[in-house]
Amino acid sequence: DILRLWIASTDFRSEMVASDEIFKRVSDQYRRIRNTLRFLLGNINDFDHKTDAIDLNNLLELDKWILEEFKDLQKDVLEHYESYSYHLVVQRIHNFCVNQLGGVYLDIIKDRQYTTQQNSEIRRSAQTAMKLMIDQLVILVAPILSFTAEEIWQNDADLKANKASV
C-alpha cells in the first residue's frame, strides 16, 4: 500500500522522483491514514448501527460538524478521482485525517468515548458519526490503499455482513 500511495501521491503529469526521504514521508502519510481508520474502527466495535445509532438531527453539534466536513471530503475526493488527480485525492484524505479528524474531532471526543457510560447518548452520537464516516472512508481509500481498506472491511462486522469485500 505504501508503494501505491507513493504512486498516487505523485502528479503523473510531471517527473516522478523516488528517494529514501520521499518514502519516509509517504510511510508517515500512510501511517496517519491507517491509524485514523483503526481508531475509528476500534471506537465502534461495540456499536450496532441498527440499534444504537442516533438520528442525525439529534447528533451533538460537533458530530454534525464532522459529518459536514466529511461530506465536503467525499465531494472533493470523487471529483479528484473523476479527473484522475490522484495526488489531490491523497492530499485531501490525508489532510482530513490529520487536521479535521486527528487534530480536532477525535481529540475532543476521546473523553466522551472513554469516560461516559457505554450506552450514553453522547457516546452513541460520536459512534454514529464515526460509523457513517468509516463506512464511506474505506470506500474512498480503496482504489489506492486496497489492502488497508480490505483489512478495515474484514474487521467491521456490519460491512462484512452486507458485502464480502470492499
What are the residue ranges of the model-derived segments?
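Helix-rich, typically C-terminal accessory recognition domains appended to large enzymatic cores
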Residues: 2-166
